[in-house]
Amino acid sequence: MTTETRSLYSQLPAIDRLLRDSSFLSLRDTYGHTRVVELLRQMLDEAREVIRGSQTLPAWCENWAQEVDARLTKEAQSALRPVINLTGTVLHTNLGRALQAEAAVEAVTKAMRSPVTLEYDLDDAGRGHRDRALAQLLCRITGAEDACIVNNNAAAVLLMLAATASGKEVVVSRGELVEIGGAFRIPDVMRQAGCTLHEVGTTNRTHANDYRQAVNENTALLMKVHTSNYSIQGFTKAIDEAELVALGKELDVPVVTDLGSGSLVDLSQYGLPKEPMPQELIAAGVSLVSFSGDKLLGGPQAGIIVGKKEMIARLQSHPLKRALRADKMTLAALEATLRLYLHPEALSKKLPTLRLLTRSAEVIQIQAQRLQAPLAAHYGAEFAVQVMPCLSQIGSGSLPVDRLPSAALTFTPHDGRGSHLESLAARWRELPVPVIGRIYDGRLWLDLRCLEDEQRFLEMLLK
C-alpha cells in the first residue's frame, strides 16, 4: 500500500464520530439509528473500493450527512409515485388506468379507517355476502338478475368459464380469440378453466350456421368476446348477441360475453364513439356479461359479472370465487363509483375518466397557448416550444381505432439531436412529481388532455 493510499484511508471517518455530529441527529430521528448506521457502513465500503480503484476519495466524502440524506430520501420514496400523465393516453395501463372520483376516494378512506359491514347483516346480526350491496346497484343499472365482483376482468372470465363450462366445450368465433396486455389470451384462459375451445368461422367472417354446426352434446356455452383492443375492417361478418341468444335458445345453450372495457353509459351522447353496454346485452338475453371496473366505467380495478341469477349462483359457489374476490377497499370504491351512474346528468363532472375523455380540443388548445409562454421563456435556449394539434387515445384496449382531437406542447431541440430529447424526458421523470410525455417525430410531446392542475405542472417544469 502506497503512502498516498494510506493517507486516503486515514481520511475516512469513524461511524461513531459521524453519528455524534449534529447534522446526523435529524437523520437518525427521521430514518432511525439502525438504517443510518447500515448506510454509513455501506458508504464506507464504497469509499474504500473507490480508493483501491482510482486512488481518490468519492466527491460525497466532503459532506457525509448530505449524501446520507439524499440516499435515504430517495429510498423512502413510494414505489407508487404520483405522476403527471401527458402521454396522450387517458386510461394508461402502466400509469394505473382510471383516476378515482372524489366520492370513491372518500369511501375507500372510510373503509380503511374503520370496521365495515363487509360480510355482516345489520338486520339480523348474521353473516352477509360481500357482493350483495353492489349486486343490487348493478342490477338496477344494467337490468340483470344478479351480479358478482372479482378482482379484475381476467379473473371474471376465468371464473365464468370454470364455473359453467369446466370439462366441456365453449364455442367462440376465430375472429374473437383475443390477446390483451401481458399475454392474456382467451385460448389460454379456457385451458386454465378446464374448458375445450371450439373455434368457428374465419378471422374476418363468422356466420350463425358456424355456431350451429359446432354445437354438440358436450357444448356448455356460446361465447362472444368484444374485440376492444383491435378492429377487423373490410370484408367482415359477425353475428350480434341478440342473434346468438336466439340460436342458443333454440339449441338450449347459454350465451356469455366478455365485454372487456364495459361502458355503463352511451358514450355517443358525449361525442365519443359508442361502445356496447352491459345493459344492452342483458336486454338481448345474454346469460352472463363480464367487464372491467377501471376502464371506461372509471372506477377501481375490478371484474364485474352480471346476468341470470342461476348462473351467478354457480359462480358464487365455485371455489375460485374466494381466491378471486375483491377486498373491502375495491368494493367501497366501486360502490361509490356506481352510485354516480344513478345521476347521469352530473356524471361527466364527477367522474374523472369521463371528464377527461370529453374535454374539447378547443379548451385544451387555449390551455396550451396559456402555458406556452412561460415554458418557452424557460426552455427556449435549447428547445423550440410550440403548441401543436394532436390526437389522444382512450387506452387500456378501449376503442382502439378511435382518436380524440387534442393539443400538445412540443419541445424540439434547436440542434436536432435526439439525445437532447431523451435527456429532457429523463430530467422530467426525476422531478418530485414526474412529468411523463412521449417522444415522436423529433419532438417531445406533452398532450394536455389529462392536465387539470396547471399550477403543479408549472412548478415542476420551471424548477
UniProtKB/Swiss-Prot annotation:
<dbReference type="InterPro" id="IPR015424">
    <property type="entry name" value="PyrdxlP-dep_Trfase"/>
</dbReference>
<keyword id="KW-0711">Selenium</keyword>
<dbReference type="GO" id="GO:0005737">
    <property type="term" value="C:cytoplasm"/>
</dbReference>
<dbReference type="InterPro" id="IPR015421">
    <property type="entry name" value="PyrdxlP-dep_Trfase_major"/>
</dbReference>
<keyword id="KW-0963">Cytoplasm</keyword>
<comment type="function">
    <text>Converts seryl-tRNA(Sec) to selenocysteinyl-tRNA(Sec) required for selenoprotein biosynthesis.</text>
</comment>
<feature type="modified residue" description="N6-(pyridoxal phosphate)lysine">
    <location>
        <position position="295"/>
    </location>
</feature>
<keyword id="KW-0648">Protein biosynthesis</keyword>
<dbReference type="Pfam" id="PF03841">
    <property type="entry name" value="SelA"/>
</dbReference>
<protein>
    <recommendedName>
        <fullName>L-seryl-tRNA(Sec) selenium transferase</fullName>
        <ecNumber>2.9.1.1</ecNumber>
    </recommendedName>
</protein>
<dbReference type="Pfam" id="PF12390">
    <property type="entry name" value="Se-cys_synth_N"/>
</dbReference>
<dbReference type="GO" id="GO:0001717">
    <property type="term" value="P:conversion of seryl-tRNAsec to selenocys-tRNAsec"/>
</dbReference>
<keyword id="KW-0808">Transferase</keyword>
<dbReference type="InterPro" id="IPR004534">
    <property type="entry name" value="SelA_trans"/>
</dbReference>
<dbReference type="GO" id="GO:0004125">
    <property type="term" value="F:L-seryl-tRNA(Sec) selenium transferase activity"/>
</dbReference>
<comment type="similarity">
    <text>Belongs to the SelA family.</text>
</comment>
<keyword id="KW-0663">Pyridoxal phosphate</keyword>
<dbReference type="GO" id="GO:0001514">
    <property type="term" value="P:selenocysteine incorporation"/>
</dbReference>
<dbReference type="InterPro" id="IPR018319">
    <property type="entry name" value="SelA-like"/>
</dbReference>
<dbReference type="InterPro" id="IPR025862">
    <property type="entry name" value="SelA_trans_N_dom"/>
</dbReference>
<comment type="pathway">
    <text>Aminoacyl-tRNA biosynthesis; selenocysteinyl-tRNA(Sec) biosynthesis; selenocysteinyl-tRNA(Sec) from L-seryl-tRNA(Sec) (bacterial route): step 1/1.</text>
</comment>
<comment type="subunit">
    <text>Homodecamer; pentamer of dimers. Binds only one seryl-tRNA(Sec) per dimer.</text>
</comment>
